[in-house]
Amino acid sequence: MDLMEKNLELVEIQKLEGHTDRVWSVAWNPVSSHADGVSPILASCSGDNTVRIWEQSSLSRSWTCKTVLEETHTRTVRSCAWSPSGQLLATASFDGTTGIWKNYGSEFECISTLEGHENEVKSVSWNASGSCLATCSRDKSVWIWEVLEGNEYDCAAVLTGHTQDVKMVQWHPTMDVLFSCSYDNTIKVWWSEDDDGEYQCVQTLGESNNGHSSTVWSISFNAAGDKMVTCSDDLTLKIWGTDIAKMQSGEEYAPWIHLCTLSGYHDRTIYSAHWSRDDIIASGAGDNAIRLFVDSKHDSVDGPSYNLLLKKNKAHENDVNSVQWSPGEGNRLLASASDDGMVKIWQLATKP
């Protein structure tokens, strides 16, 4: 289906109010958003030191705040991420800790607190199997934590290499390859060649190899895992590709190569980019706007190119910090978080 030929619009479904400070990040529960008859669940985290859990009613289709996770973090909660099972929620905070919350149905309990970073924790990410998670911090380090029995978490590795604040960590969707991006303008790829847990930096994507020229804020992968989008303070989005079959065979590391750069679509820092399961890239930026892009399907001599699908100006009243597509197939729901204190739910729909 050629999305460019369809007359699409991004429709605001609901504005979720409750946070009393800027909202930094949103995360969809991976299980609830898939299952038939199960209400979608969204987590949001904020400068008000809390995480809110939102649920959509199966009857009214409206969203309500089901619970507020508070009194664990003493400073801003910068990032939140669900485990693949949807049972655990990890929360990264400026207080230097990462909280692990267990979903007991109607309530959540903080079952573990990961300590070790010297400064603010900026991001947290689970690997595809849920056997470990990664965190990163203003202390320039990336930590890998192994999930043990009895709600115990063990620091398996401390990865150093970035020269500045690390903004985000993201595991590859199908393999235990970890990606980090930083205020040092680079993306680093970490891989354990022998699967022995000894992670090494196997590639650095920087300005010298068609990378970004300023802070890299966000990383996201397409469903197949053979392409990656990154976004930056340099006002661009970049698309990268790899030989995924070679990587999955385990024979050797297949380097990521720059495929194309999308520029001129935002005029302030691009803070977030997220790739949907049906291949639509969303971006959110400091210009209060959201943009959607799709593969043009017309590969030129220079490689693939991406077209602007639509633009939503004034999506929020302030910076858009996070955009996240629902993992559910075909529903085309997008959540956004902003400095204006709001979370918004959008639907990509055909114009009437």
Swiss-Prot record:
GO terms for cellular component: cytosolic [4Fe-4S] assembly targeting complex; nucleus
Record's keyword annotation contains Cytoplasm: yes
Listed name of the protein: Protein CIA1
Protein species of origin: Arabidopsis thaliana
Main function: Essential component of the cytosolic iron-sulfur (Fe-S) protein assembly (CIA) machinery. Required for the maturation of extramitochondrial Fe/S proteins.
Subcellular localization, as worded in the UniProt entry: Nucleus; Cytoplasm
Family the UniProt entry places it in: Belongs to the WD repeat CIA1 family.
Record flagged with keyword Nucleus: yes
Gene disruption phenotype: Embryonic lethality when homozygous.
WD repeat placement: 18-64, 72-111, 116-155, 161-200, 211-250, 265-303, 315-352
Keywords, sorted A to Z: Cytoplasm, Nucleus, Repeat, WD repeat
GO biological process: iron-sulfur cluster assembly
Subunit structure: Part of a complex composed of AE7, CIA1, MMS19 and NAR1. Interacts with AE7 and NAR1.
InterPro entries, per database record: CIAO1/Cia1, G-protein_beta_WD-40_rep, WD40/YVTN_repeat-like_dom_sf, WD40_repeat_CS, WD40_repeat_dom_sf, WD40_rpt
